[in-house]
């Protein structure tokens, strides 16, 4: 397949305050942002010893993930880069390819994600697709054990669903030629139905079957019905808990209910004979999965556990040593802030790690 002509251009950002006409505003904004980050990190550290209501802290972090001033400071500063480096494999294609090769050497598969969402023009969508075409070429040329994960809003879904479909279809076609796979990421609940419909349309082409899949979030009430539909169409699924802020009318508000639904959905997926991914760092969910496949006689190579880059590396290695397949989701790029904040929101250990390191020189 011919590589997209759209070249990947790394965004070269400057520290806030470099534009003379905005010096005063930027200085105030920068100082306020630093104070805000320091305050959040302090709250996280204190909460480790004197627990606060976790849903409140989670909601705060998700709200901050949408704060433009914090995002601008974080993505353009050395401090932000240092904070994100645990979970984000650099900003360039070459950096993420090196990270993927390193993970592969440990016997672990990878899924590569060029960070970004909600593009504002068809040109931005084409540029984002161009990055993925470069990744697919490199995966084939370097014989990496890797696939790619793509958000439809990055392909132009907000602008024109037909544009997003065209961009995604070109990537799946390329993945077929490269003998790999495209995972369509799930975003907020506003996009759930459109995402499932588009994956169904992509999978309906005979040549694409087995080369495109989707993500289902266990915290949504609708997920069992969605899984039943997708299984009937033979579509591969990544099951995760979900990391976006959703109302109680759409999603289970309590972790215990999310966990119960996760186990229920896992038990629906794994006997289907389709290769699925169980995406969790929760040892209780992992142990429930291990017990279930043992009871049902499901071989360890009939599914995979999936985890995030930089999270529970010890557990990744343990699962591989025990004979299970593991895939690590590796994000990269300059637009890392929303992803990073959602990772802090969903897992206390991530928050504590970052908060402690924020105050270290």
Regions found by a protein language model. Give the residues of each.
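Helicase P-loop NTPase motor core of nucleic-acid translocases
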Residues: 43-45
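Cationic, low-complexity basic patches in intrinsically disordered or flexible, solvent-exposed regions
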Residues: 3-4, 8-16, 20, 49
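Positively charged, amphipathic and often flexible ligand-engagement surfaces
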Residues: 50-361
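Enrichment for repetitive, rod-forming helical segments
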Residues: 9-10, 19, 35, 350, ...
């Amino acid at each position: 397949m011919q590589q997209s002509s759209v070249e990947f251009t790394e965004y070269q950002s400057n520290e806030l305050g470099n534009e003379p006409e905005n010096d005063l505003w930027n200085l105030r904004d920068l100082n306020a942002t630093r104070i805000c980050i320091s305050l959040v990190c302090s709250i996280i550290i204190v909460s480790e010893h004197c627990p606060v209501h976790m849903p409140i802290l989670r909601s705060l972090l998700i709200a901050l993930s949408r704060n433009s001033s914090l995002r601008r400071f974080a993505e353009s500063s050395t401090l932000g880069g240092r904070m994100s480096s645990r979970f984000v494999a650099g900003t360039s294609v070459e950096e993420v390819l090196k990270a993927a090769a390193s993970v592969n050497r440990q016997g672990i598969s990878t899924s590569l994600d060029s960070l970004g969402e909600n593009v504002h023009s068809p040109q931005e969508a084409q540029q984002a697709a161009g990055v993925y075409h470069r990744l697919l070429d490199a995966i084939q040329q370097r014989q990496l054990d890797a696939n790619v994960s793509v958000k439809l809003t990055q392909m132009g879904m907000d602008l024109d669903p037909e544009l997003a479909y065209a961009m995604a279809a070109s990537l799946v076609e390329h993945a077929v030629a490269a003998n790999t796979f495209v995972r369509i990421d799930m975003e907020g609940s506003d996009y759930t139905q459109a995402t499932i419909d588009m994956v169904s349309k992509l999978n309906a082409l005979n040549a694409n079957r087995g080369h495109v899949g989707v993500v289902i979030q266990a915290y949504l009430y609708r997920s069992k019905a969605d899984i039943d539909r997708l299984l009937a169409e033979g579509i591969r699924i990544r099951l995760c808990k979900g990391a976006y802020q959703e109302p109680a009318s759409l999603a289970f508000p309590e972790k215990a209910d999310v966990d119960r639904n996760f186990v229920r959905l896992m038990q629906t997926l794994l006997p289907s004979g389709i290769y699925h991914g169980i995406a969790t760092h929760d040892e209780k969910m992992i142990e429930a999965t291990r017990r279930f496949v043992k009871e049902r006689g499901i071989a360890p190579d009939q599914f995979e556990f999936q985890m995030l880059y930089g999270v529970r590396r010890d557990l990744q290695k343990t699962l591989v040593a025990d004979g299970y397949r593991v895939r690590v989701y590796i994000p990269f790029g300059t637009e890392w802030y929303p992803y990073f904040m959602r990772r802090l929101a969903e897992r206390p250990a991530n928050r504590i790690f970052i908060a402690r390191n924020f105050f270290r020189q």
